[in-house]
Amino acid sequence: MSRPLTFLGIESSCDDTAAAVVRAEGTRAEILSSVVDGQTALHAAFGGVVPEIAARAHAERLDLCVERALEEAGLGLRDLDGIAVTAGPGLIGGVLSGVMLAKGLAAGTGLPLVGVNHLAGHALTPRLTDGLAFPYLMLLVSGGHCQFLIARGAEEFSRLGGSIDDAPGEAFDKTAKLLGLPQPGGPSVEAEAAAGDPRRFAFPRPMLDRPGCDMSFSGLKTALLRARDGLVAEKGGLTRADRADLCAGFQAAVVEVLAEKTRRALAVYAAEGAAEPALAVAGGVAANGPIRAALTRVAEAAGVRFLAPPLRLCTDNAAMIAWAGIERFRAGGRDGMELSARPRWPLDRSAPALIGSGRKGAKA
C-alpha cells in the first residue's frame, strides 16, 4: 500500500474560489476541509460570469480560502506532502491567480507542485468518493463542458463524444436568463420545471438522428427563445405556468438527449471488458435530479453500477483538485516553476477538437 499523502488543493478556474485539504491512504481518502467562496452575487446582474470580475475576486480571496482550509483541517503547510492546483482549462485570469499562489507556496515550503487538469478533477471524483476502479465510463456535464470519457488511469482518458457547441449547463443558464429566473440557471430551471408540463412544447432532441455520442444544445436554446417570443407576442407576457412548462419541456429534452447518448457510450465502453463496469457522472449539471434519475435507469438497464458524487462535489471544488493531484503525484507527475496556466487543455489529446465554444472558451 502506498504511504499516506496529504495535499492542499487550489481551484479558481471559473467563478468559485476554493481550497481544500485531502488525505489519502491507498484507495481510501478523507476530505479534511473544503472551502468554497462562490461569486454568484458578483455576477448576478450580468446574467453570466464576467471574466474580469471573476479574476479580480480570485486574486482577493484565494489566500484567505487557503488559510481557512488549513485552519479547518487543523494543519499547517509543514504537515502537507504536496500542493495541487488547477492549471486549466478555464478562464485564464482566474487560473493564473491560482497557479501563481500555488507556485509561491511551493517555492516557500519546498513542497512538490502538481498542476491538475480541471476536467480530470471532475472525472476522478468517483475515485475520491467511492474508490471506483479503472476503467469506468464518465459523463462530465457542466457549465462549460459535456463529454463522454473512458477513464483508464489518472492521466489516461479516451473521449467518445461531446457537445459540438454549447454545454448543457450553459444552456440551462441561458434558459434561466431568457425566462427572467435567477442565476445559476440549473437549480432555477429545475425548480420551475417541477411544476410544469413537459409535453406542452415540442422542443427538438438535437442529434438523436445521427450516430455516435456527440451532442448539440444550441438549437434547443433557439427553440425555447422562439417559443417564449411566441407566447409574449400572443399574450403580452409569460404566466407562471408558461415559465414552468417552458422549463419542463427544455429539461425533458436535455434529459432525453443525455440518456440516449449515454446508452450509446455504454455500448462502446462494454468493449473494455471491465471487471466491475460502472457509469459515473460529474460536473455541476450532475446535481440535476431528473438527469440523475434518467442516468440511473440507463445504467440499471445496461447492468452497470451508477455513481454520482454528493451534490457538494458536483460543482467546482478544491477537494477534487487535491485528490487528482494525489493521483497524478502517485503516478510520478509533478511540475516545476515553469507550470503555466492554460485556457484550453483537452483530457484526450489524441481526439479531434470539438467544434464550437462554450462559456469557458474553446472546448477542451
From Swiss-Prot:
It is an enzyme of class 2 (transferase). Its cofactor is Fe(2+). GO terms for molecular function: iron ion binding; N(6)-L-threonylcarbamoyladenine synthase activity. Pfam families: TsaD. Binds 1 Fe(2+) ion per subunit. The keyword NAD does not apply. Its EC number is 2.3.1.234. Keywords: Acyltransferase, Cytoplasm, Iron, Metal-binding, Transferase, tRNA processing. Fe cation binds at residues 118, 122, 316. InterPro entries: ATPase_NBD, Gcp-like_dom, KAE1/TsaD, TsaD. Signal peptide: none annotated. Its main location: cytoplasm. GO terms for cellular component: cytoplasm. Belongs to the KAE1 / TsaD family. This is tRNA N6-adenosine threonylcarbamoyltransferase. The gene is tsaD.
